[in-house]
C-alpha cells in the first residue's frame, strides 16, 4: 500500500521521508514549477519563501527544543538545516538554496518515492492520504478541501490577536468580569481612563505597520479589520468596538471605565490570554511598545504577537485528532501550516508526526499521540483542543506545555526544566514505541 502526499513543502517533504524510512512507498504530488504560487520562486522542495531563519537554537526557546526533538526522531528537515547552517548568532539560519536542494535531491532520488509534478484539483480517492498543501494552497484544491471539511471550517487568512503570559498581567489593575455580570467572569479586563485612552490611541494610529505583500492586498475585505485600521476611522470607533466599556465596573473606582481592553483565556490551563479584537498588522516592536501602554499590561510578556496574512488553514479543533488524522476519515491526514501550526519548524514537525502515523496505518499499527509535555506533542494537543470558535494558528511556545509538577522560580530555569522533562519523556516514548533515529 502506498501513501499519497499532496505538497512537497516542509511538511510534505518531512512526511515523505518518515514514511519511506519505515519501508512504505510514497506517491508525492507537487505542482511547482508547472503551477507556481505567488510566493515561490523555484520547483524545489521545502523552499523557504520568507526568512532563512529557523529561529532560536537554545533549548530555553521552545522552538529550539522542538528542533532537538526532531533531530532525535531522524528528521530530514533538521539534517538538511544543520548541514547548510549559516552564522546567525543564537538562531539556526540556513543557506536557503543549499537547504532546499539537499532535501529535493534526497527525495527525488529515493527508490520508494514516485514524484508527480502536477496540480491536484480534487481530493484523490487513494488512502492513506496526507494533505500538506501549505498556506498558499491553490484555489482549486482549496475548494476541494472545503468540500471535504465543510466551508465553515476552512479559512484563507490569519487574523490573530497578540497573546500574553497570564503571570505577566498586573492583577492589581486588571479585573475579572463579564459584561453586566452575565454568566461566569470569563474576561480579564484592563480599564482605561480618558487620558490613558488618548495616549494609547495616538500611539496606535501612528505606529508602524508591516507592508502588505501583493497577494495579501485583499485581506481587509475578508471581515478581519486590524485594530489600527479600525482606529484610524475615528477616535470613537474603538469605544464602540473592541474597547467598549459598557456593562463593566472597575472595582477600584466603582465606576464604568472610559475604555476597556478585554483578555480571554487562550488555553485550558489559563496560562495565556489573548487581547480580544486586537488582530493587527503592526510590526512586532511597535506591538510591544503600544500594547504595553494598556493599564495592567505594562510588563506584559508576549507569547505571540498579532499577525495578519494570507494563510490557508482548517479548523483543527473541530476536524483533527492529535495524530493529525481527520476525525471523520482517519485515513486522511493533514500536515503543516494548513493545520494551524505556525512557522517553518512547526510545519515540518507536523509532517513528521503525520508521516510516521500514516506509515503505521499501512503497517496495521495504531497511530501515535506524542506526549503533551514534549514540543512535538504540545503542538497537536493545542491545535486539536483550542476553542474552535476563536481558533488561530500558533507557534510552539512553553505556554502550550502542561504545568511543571514542581514550582520553579525564574523564567529561564522554568524553561530549562520544561526542556529536560520533554527530552526525558520523548526518550521513554521512543523506547516504548520502538522509534529509532537511524533506520
Swiss-Prot record:
Its cofactor is FAD. It catalyses: uridine(54) in tRNA + (6R)-5,10-methylene-5,6,7,8-tetrahydrofolate + NADH + H(+) = 5-methyluridine(54) in tRNA + (6S)-5,6,7,8-tetrahydrofolate + NAD(+); uridine(54) in tRNA + (6R)-5,10-methylene-5,6,7,8-tetrahydrofolate + NADPH + H(+) = 5-methyluridine(54) in tRNA + (6S)-5,6,7,8-tetrahydrofolate + NADP(+). PROSITE patterns: GIDA_2. It is an enzyme of class 2 (transferase). GO terms for biological process: tRNA methylation; tRNA wobble uridine modification. InterPro entries: FAD/NAD-bd_sf, MnmG-rel, MnmG-rel_CS, MnmG_N, TrmFO. It is found in: Cytoplasm. The keyword Transferase applies. Keywords: Cytoplasm, FAD, Flavoprotein, Methyltransferase, NAD, NADP, Transferase, tRNA processing. Its EC number is 2.1.1.74. One of its GO terms (cellular component) is cytosol. It holds the Pfam family GIDA. One of its GO terms (molecular function) is tRNA (uracil(54)-C5)-methyltransferase activity, 5,10-methylenetetrahydrofolate-dependent. FAD binds at residues 7-12. Catalyzes the folate-dependent formation of 5-methyl-uridine at position 54 (M-5-U54) in all tRNAs. Belongs to the MnmG family. TrmFO subfamily. This is Methylenetetrahydrofolate--tRNA-(uracil-5-)-methyltransferase TrmFO. It comes from Heliobacterium modesticaldum (strain ATCC 51547 / Ice1).
Amino acid at each position: 500500500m502506498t501513501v499519497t502526499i499532496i505538497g512537497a513543502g516542509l511538511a510534505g517533504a518531512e512526511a515523505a521521508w518518515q514514511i519511506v524510512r519505515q519501508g512504505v512507498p510514497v506517491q508525492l504530488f507537487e505542482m511547482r514549477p508547472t503551477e507556481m504560487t505567488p510566493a515561490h520562486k523555484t520547483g524545489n522542495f521545502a523552499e523557504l519563501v520568507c526568512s532563512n531563519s529557523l529561529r532560536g537554537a537554545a533549548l530555553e526557546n521552545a522552538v529550539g527544543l522542538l528542533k532537538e526533538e526532531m533531530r532525535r526522531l531522524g528528521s530530514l528537515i533538521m539534517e538538511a538545516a544543520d548541514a547548510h547552517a549559516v552564522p546567525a548568532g543564537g538562531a539556526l539560519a540556513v543557506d536557503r538554496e543549499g537547504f532546499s536542494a539537499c532535501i529535493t535531491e534526497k527525495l527525488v532520488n529515493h527508490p520508494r518515492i514516485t514524484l508527480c509534478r502536477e496540480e491536484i484539483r480534487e481530493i484523490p480517492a487513494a488512502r492513506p492520504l496526507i494533505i500538506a498543501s501549505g498556506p498558499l494552497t491553490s484555489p482549486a484544491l482549496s475548494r476541494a478541501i472545503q468540500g471535504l471539511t465543510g466551508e465553515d471550517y476552512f479559512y484563507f487568512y490569519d487574523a490573530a490577536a497578540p497573546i500574553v503570559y497570564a503571570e505577566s498581567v498586573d492583577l492589581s489593575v486588571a479585573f475579572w468580569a463579564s459584561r453586566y455580570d452575565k454568566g461566569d467572569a470569563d474576561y480579564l479586563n484592563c480599564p482605561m481612563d480618558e487620558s490613558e485612552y488618548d495616549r494609547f490611541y495616538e500611539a496606535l494610529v501612528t505606529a508602524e505597520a508591516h507592508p502588505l505583500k501583493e497577494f495579501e492586498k485583499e485581506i481587509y475585505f475578508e471581515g478581519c479589520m486590524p485594530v489600527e485600521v479600525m482606529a484610524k476611522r475615528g477616535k470613537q470607533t474603538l469605544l464602540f468596538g473592541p474597547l467598549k466599556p459598557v456593562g463593566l465596573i472597575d472595582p477600584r473606582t466603582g465606576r464604568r471605565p472610559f475604555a476597556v481592553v478585554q483578555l480571554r483565556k487562550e488555553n485550558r490551563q489559563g496560562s495565556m490570554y489573548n487581547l480580544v479584537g486586537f488582530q493587527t498588522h503592526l510590526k512586532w516592536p511597535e506591538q510591544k511598545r503600544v500594547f504595553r501602554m494598556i493599564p495592567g499590561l505594562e510588563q506584559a510578556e508576549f507569547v505571540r504577537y498579532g499577525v495578519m496574512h494570507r494563510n490557508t488553514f482548517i479548523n483543527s479543533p473541530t476536524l483533527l485528532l492529535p495524530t493529525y488524522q481527520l476525525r471523520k476519515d482517519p485515513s486522511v491526514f493533514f500536515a503543516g501550516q494548513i493545520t494551524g501550526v505556525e512557522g517553518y519548524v512547526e510545519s515540518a514537525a507536523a509532517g513528521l508526526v503525520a508521516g510516521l502515523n500514516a506509515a503505521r496505518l499501512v503497517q496495521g499499527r495504531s497511530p501515535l499521540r506524542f506526549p503533551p509535555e514534549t514540543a512535538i506533542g504540545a503542538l497537536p494537543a493545542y491545535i486539536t483542543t483550542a476553542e474552535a470558535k476563536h481558533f488561530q494558528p500558533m507557534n510552539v511556545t512553553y505556554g502550550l506545555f502542561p504545568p511543571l509538577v514542581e514550582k520553579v522560580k525564574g523564567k529561564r530555569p522554568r524553561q530549562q526544566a520544561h526542556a529536560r522533562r520533554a527530552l526525558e519523556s520523548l526518550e521513554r516514548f521512543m523506547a516504548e514505541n520502538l522509534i529509532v533515529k537511524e533506520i
